[in-house]
């Protein structure tokens, strides 16, 4: 497999899973093209570093709000109109333009590329990959980092119907299917029995870190959580409440991600109402995937606070979990289906708490406060697990076997 074209509906920085695959193939001598588009303003700067490192690899389409505003507005209007028209028709490319702002532009570019394989990362990119493959005769791969039809609480939601329609129309035309968690693979196979998903965990390349005993008596215990966006219904309010419930100890919560001022104020107000000190809640601006390991390693415990709603949040394994482990942090995780299954497989990685049970979460935090030696040993064991098993160097073989055997 010499030529591989990736298609995504976001930016490279917002899809580190795609970047890992693209860089792996590039290093093996493949000609790699990534068709992408604007998604988040904060990712622009880190995208620039990536595109400079790999000149010509990343092709942007569909404009952006600053330099190509007219094209950007046009594509947004088209997507909104298509979303409205989807209620009435499934013809004329309406569903494809509704699921992706840049479907038309990505398809036009992809059809002109001489490639052996198109790989779609996320559901919105799949129609362009399949239709391009029909035109060029190439193969198609699909990566399910999420279960897209599981992102809704009601099957009557029009967005659910759109996602389900795209899945039903295009899944049968892929040559391989990867999933980011065992349960995403299981649920998709349950819905589409012709699929044979291969699980490729959301791990990262190994990093050499010095894991010291960060937490010491009479010093703050540092909790860490990160995501592209710091928003509501992510379990963070429960962490703040649990911090307040632990009396007589100083605990800090560090949040990394893009956060609007309204939600930032809401979290700060909650902390203040619970009599937490101002220096117990920290906000950090987004950074590139290359920087996150060194940044995260200064903390003690990684928080995996999925609420389990909707279904996708119950069955996904985010890159948080693997980042925490590979950085040598202990982990406190909510008992979603996926995280419970993971903790059963790797029980030494941390503590599992019951969702919507504040005392359960408080007890987990208190355990590490009272047992700094156990915390340090867990951190050392997690770092070693990341060096020996849960890393991209190990996981990449699954991906390469799929690509090479098409």
Language model regions located:
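Nucleotide-activated donor-binding/catalytic signature segment of Leloir-type glycosyltransferases, i.e.
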Residues: 257, 265-294, 301
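Membrane-proximal helix-turn-helix segments that form the acceptor-binding/catalytic region
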Residues: 92-111, 127, 131-135, 142, ...
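A charged, aromatic-enriched C-terminal amphipathic alpha-helix characteristic of glycosyltransferases
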Residues: 370-403
């Amino acid at each position: 497999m010499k030529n591989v074209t990736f298609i995504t509906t976001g930016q490279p920085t917002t899809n580190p899973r795609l970047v890992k695959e693209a860089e792996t193939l590039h290093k093996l001598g493949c000609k790699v093209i990534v068709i992408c588009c604007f998604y988040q303003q904060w990712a622009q700067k880190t995208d620039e570093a990536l595109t400079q490192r790999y000149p010509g690899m990343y092709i942007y389409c569909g404009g952006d709000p600053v330099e190509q505003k007219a094209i950007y507005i046009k594509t947004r209007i088209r997507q909104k109109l298509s979303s409205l028209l989807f209620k009435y028709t499934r013809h004329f490319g309406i569903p494809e333009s509704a699921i992706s702002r840049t479907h038309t532009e990505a398809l036009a570019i992809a059809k002109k590329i001489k490639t052996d394989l198109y790989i779609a990362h996320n559901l919105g990119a799949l129609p362009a990959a399949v239709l391009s493959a029909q035109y060029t005769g190439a193969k198609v791969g699909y990566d399910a980092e999420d279960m897209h039809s599981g992102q809704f609480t009601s099957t009557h939601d029009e967005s659910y119907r759109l996602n389900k329609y795209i899945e039903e129309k295009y899944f049968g035309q892929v040559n391989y299917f990867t999933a980011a968690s065992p349960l995403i693979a299981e649920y998709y196979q349950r819905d589409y029995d012709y699929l044979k998903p291969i699980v490729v965990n959301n791990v990262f390349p190994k990093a050499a870190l010095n894991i010291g005993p960060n937490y010491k008596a009479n010093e703050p215990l540092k909790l860490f959580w990160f995501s592209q966006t710091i928003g509501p219904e992510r379990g963070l309010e429960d962490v703040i409440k649990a911090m307040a419930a632990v009396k007589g100890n100083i605990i800090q919560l560090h949040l990394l991600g893009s956060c609007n001022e309204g939600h930032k104020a809401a979290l700060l107000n909650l902390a203040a109402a619970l009599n937490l000190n101002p220096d117990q809640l920290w906000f950090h601006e987004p950074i590139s995937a290359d920087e996150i390991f060194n940044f995260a390693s200064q903390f003690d415990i990684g928080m995996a606070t999925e609420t389990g709603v909707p279904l996708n949040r119950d069955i996904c394994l985010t890159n948080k979990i693997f980042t925490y482990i590979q950085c040598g942090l202990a982990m406190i995780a909510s008992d979603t289906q996926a995280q419970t299954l993971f903790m059963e497989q790797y029980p030494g990685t941390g503590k599992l708490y019951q969702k919507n049970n504040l005392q359960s979460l408080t007890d987990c935090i208190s355990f590490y406060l009272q047992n700094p030696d156990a915390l340090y040993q867990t951190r050392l064991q997690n770092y070693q697990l990341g060096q020996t098993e849960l890393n991209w160097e190990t996981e990449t073989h699954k991906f390469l076997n799929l690509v090479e055997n098409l």
